[in-house]
């Protein structure tokens, strides 16, 4: 289990104060969901309680990506390489990442590509932790992502849009524990 706390202010009305508040309430690992482009942001996220940060490979040149990856690791944080194409996944692997998140939402148009994870995940080594971001709204979606190799999913939209957040969360968590879920085998 992991909590992804949205701290990006402009599109999601999140803040580091929100993450600090969540950090006080739970002991689960937390990822600071923001667009990280500067080492200062990594230090800031760590100070506010983040255990991990996302690095969006598609908007960073290779040198910047690797420098931010090194900075996160030097602070004892996990860096999640967020990719949208097989080429971005290759760049992340060349840098030596251990966690790759395939984001099904396009960065520029905010369109959903429901096949992104199924297209990219098979090319990732088995030792890499694979996360599916976006497109998981139902227990069936979760099981489909797991059958394509997902070790974890981010289902924020489904949970936050639900009339009953607790029920939606329980439904997805139960699906992840179901014997039919390939990750449970």
Sequence positions of predicted segments:
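N-terminal active-site wall of soluble small-molecule enzyme domains
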Residues: 1-80, 88-91, 99, 117-120
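Catalytic cores of alpha/beta
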Residues: 30, 37-49, 84-96, 132-155, ...
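Residues at alpha-helix caps and immediate loop-helix transition turns in enzyme cores, especially N-
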Residues: 14-18, 64, 112-116, 141, ...
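Glycine-rich phosphate-binding active-site loops on the catalytic face of alpha/beta enzymes
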Residues: 7, 44-64, 101-111, 148-169
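Structured helix-beta-strand junction loops
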Residues: 75, 126-127, 149
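Secondary-structure boundary/capping positions in well-ordered alpha/beta enzyme cores
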Residues: 29, 127-128, 179
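C-terminal helical cap(s) of enzyme catalytic domains, especially alpha/beta-barrels
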Residues: 114, 119-123, 146, 160-185
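Catalytic core of soluble alpha/beta enzymes
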Residues: 84-129, 135-145, 162-163
